[in-house]
């Protein structure tokens, strides 16, 4: 009653008294009330301690486990967060694959922190563990490869990128391979030919080969691959590459300009987009900087302007809160989830 009437102080005393009781259910309700208050007031360290106590009393309660994990993430308590994930998998709160993914993301974050603190061996070890836990986790593969290259283990770094390409070709993997390629444009083209061979028919393989061929001024090879992916509805990225090809091969300014016009109206290039709030970032992050949700960035195209307008019209008509994110001059609104 005190909480409902807005008397938080009185409610806090009541919850505290309940938490002092020996009867488990009463004590849990008191801890839960105190936890809710601490979170509402932004006292994360206090909330974390209360969540630990609540989880000890009710280790099989999904909401308690998830709250504890969220608080451990927000406070950067990565070691305990991983232990919470292991317990959640054992108690069947989450599946084994989901547990591995969470642990991989935690290992990625630990690798970043270790590198920033100058603990290079630890950074390398955490990155390796992230890749082992989630072999299709592209950011972990690129991080591990870069760290291996820094350690002078270029051949192993190349293998990491190639193994990841088999599972999930991605432009950031191609960029990592470019960084690993010693020499000039011809060497990069040879490296991309080898990489693309592991997933020959994938769109990203054709695009990676086209980019490398353009750099090496192998115009016919570039056109061959771009013709395959251009089709009737090329993405903005492919249209820009076609513009570069027309200018480079034929010095055809008009054709190049026409492709640039198509690029402006084509399907937007994919980006890392938070599935929770729509925040867009250039580099993947374990925790969204806007909504603070864990592992919510997906690689997908942002919505077209027309889609945004339709959603905004729906908001006006029905009062739905979509939580737009403004990044620079562009407003991003989440599209339906299309993949991880």
Question: Where is each model-derived feature located?
Answer:
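Repeat-based scaffolding regions
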Residues: 1-286, 290, 297-340
């Amino acid at each position: 009653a005190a909480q409902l009437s807005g008397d938080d102080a009185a409610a806090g005393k009541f919850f505290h008294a309940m938490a002092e009781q020996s009867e488990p259910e009463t004590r849990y309700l008191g801890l839960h009330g105190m936890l809710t208050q601490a979170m509402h007031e932004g006292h994360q360290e206090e909330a974390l301690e209360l969540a630990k106590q609540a989880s000890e009393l009710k280790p099989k309660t999904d909401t308690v486990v998830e709250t504890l994990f969220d608080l451990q993430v927000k406070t950067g308590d990565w070691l305990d967060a991983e232990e919470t994930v292991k317990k959640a998998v054992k108690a069947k709160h989450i599946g084994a694959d989901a547990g591995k993914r969470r642990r991989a993301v935690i290992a990625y974050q630990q690798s970043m922190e270790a590198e920033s603190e100058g603990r290079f061996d630890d950074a390398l070890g955490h990155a390796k563990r992230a890749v082992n836990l989630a072999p299709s986790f592209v950011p972990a593969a690129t991080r591990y490869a870069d760290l291996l290259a820094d350690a002078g283990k270029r051949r192993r770094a190349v293998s990491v990128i190639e193994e990841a390409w088999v599972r999930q070709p991605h432009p950031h993997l191609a960029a990592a391979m470019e960084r690993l390629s010693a020499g000039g444009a011809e060497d990069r083209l040879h490296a991309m030919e080898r990489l693309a061979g592991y997933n020959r028919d994938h769109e990203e393989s054709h695009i990676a080969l086209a980019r490398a061929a353009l750099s090496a001024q192998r115009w016919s090879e570039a056109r061959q691959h771009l013709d395959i992916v251009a089709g009737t509805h090329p993405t903005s990225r492919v249209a820009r590459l076609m513009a570069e090809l027309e200018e480079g091969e034929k010095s055809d300014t008009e054709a190049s300009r026409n492709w640039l016009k198509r690029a402006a109206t084509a399907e937007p290039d994919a980006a890392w987009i938070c599935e929770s709030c729509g925040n867009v970032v250039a580099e993947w992050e374990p925790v969204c900087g806007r909504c603070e949700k864990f592992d919510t960035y997906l690689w997908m195209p942002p919505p077209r302007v027309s889609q945004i307008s339709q959603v905004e019209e729906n908001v006006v008509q029905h009062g739905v809160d979509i939580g737009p994110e403004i990044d620079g001059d562009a407003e991003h609104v989440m599209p339906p989830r299309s993949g991880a």
